[in-house]
Amino acid sequence: MVAVLARQGRELAKRLLLIQFSAVMVAAAVFAVAVNGDWGLSALVGGGIFVIANAVFAGCAFLFAGARALKMVAISFYTGEALKILITIVLFSVAYMYMQLELVPLKLTYLLALGINICAPVLFINNKK
């Protein structure tokens, strides 16, 4: 039963990450074609920062499941969230310091992935009774 609970969460996280990754790739391609390659690369980096950080969180969040592992579930969620924030800060710092990026597509695709993270779980809700 515990493995089933964790597996369901992992599957939902995989679906969400796939949707985010696909949206980032489409946005990067659109920016590259519509404006230029620098905008496409910047969009890819901005969205990639969010997707990578979110993947790390998902990996930590669904390590444990079940009532017996309640404390470990809470610890893994807090650890995952802390790592997500830290990775986001580090990756944005690296992007700003060592890459010549356009800020508009970088921020727009980051916000696109964030918006998907907020809105897409509604699509996964199953209202069948």
UniProtKB/Swiss-Prot annotation:
Keyword terms: Cell inner membrane, Cell membrane, CF(0), Hydrogen ion transport, Ion transport, Membrane, Transmembrane, Transmembrane helix, Transport
Residue intervals passing through the bilayer: 16-36, 44-64, 77-97, 105-125
GO biological process annotation, one example: proton transmembrane transport
Membrane disposition: Multi-pass membrane protein
Highest taxon listed in the record's lineage: Bacteria
Protein's cellular compartments: Cell inner membrane
A cellular component annotation (GO) from this entry: plasma membrane
InterPro entries per record: ATP_synth_I
Protein family membership: Belongs to the bacterial AtpI family.
Role, per record: A possible function for this protein is to guide the assembly of the membrane sector of the ATPase enzyme complex.
Protein name according to UniProt: ATP synthase protein I
Organism for this UniProt entry: Vibrio cholerae serotype O1 (strain ATCC 39315 / El Tor Inaba N16961)
